[in-house]
Amino acid sequence: MIAPEYSLRDGTSLPAIGLGTYGLNEQAGIEAIVSGIAEGYRLLDTAYNYGNEDVVGEAVRRSGVDRSDLVITTKLPGRHHGYDETIASLEESRRRLDVEWVDLYLIHWPLPRIDKFVDSWKAMIRLRERGLVRSIGVSNFTADMLDRLDRETGVVPSVNQIELHPYF
């Protein structure tokens, strides 16, 4: 099962279905992710806050699937909002994942009360320009927040990942 892909406005594409890795840790997590890749998942969704980027990276290495055939998404945690903090956080994520690039880097939550998401967005634009991330996006942003990013930077997120499930 290889999922169909959707084209993004930045020219990249994402599989329609991905494997969420929240809660997948240690050896059991590695095995679950390797199994998911073997079954055809090509989009792996992790986050700094999940504490399992190293597990995802190890599963990718063990999977036998070429890195360029996988889409790895990770997310900037709220405590790392700000320009310099965003740059440093991605470097930490890349080190834990043991990858040269991240395919999709998202701001995990906007945290409007600290109002640093635009600074983080500017850093993410720079990271994309440097080739360290392929696509940049956000998670759980409102339309007004998306408009603000566009107004202040001229760059619209390629993705706005929305959390939605029966327990949310």
Regions flagged by a language model, labelled:
Residues 19, 36, 44, 56, ...:
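Conserved, mostly hydrophobic/aromatic
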Residues 1-70, 100:
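N-terminal binding-site loop/beta-alpha segment at the start of enzyme catalytic domains
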Residues 22-24, 47-49, 75-79, 107-110, ...:
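Active-site beta-loop-alpha junctions enriched in small/polar residues
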Residues 24-37, 82-97, 119, 144-148:
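Short, acidic/polar
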Residues 60, 64, 94, 128, ...:
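Conserved hydrophobic residues forming the short capping helix/wall of the S-adenosyl-L-methionine
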Residues 1-6, 54-61, 89-92, 143-147, ...:
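Alpha-helical scaffolding within the catalytic cores
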Residues 77-126:
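Glycine/small-residue-rich loop that forms an oxyanion/phosphate-binding "nest" at active or ligand-binding sites
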Residues 110-168:
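Beta/alpha (TIM)-barrel catalytic core signal, keyed to glycine-rich beta->alpha loops juxtaposed to Asp/Glu
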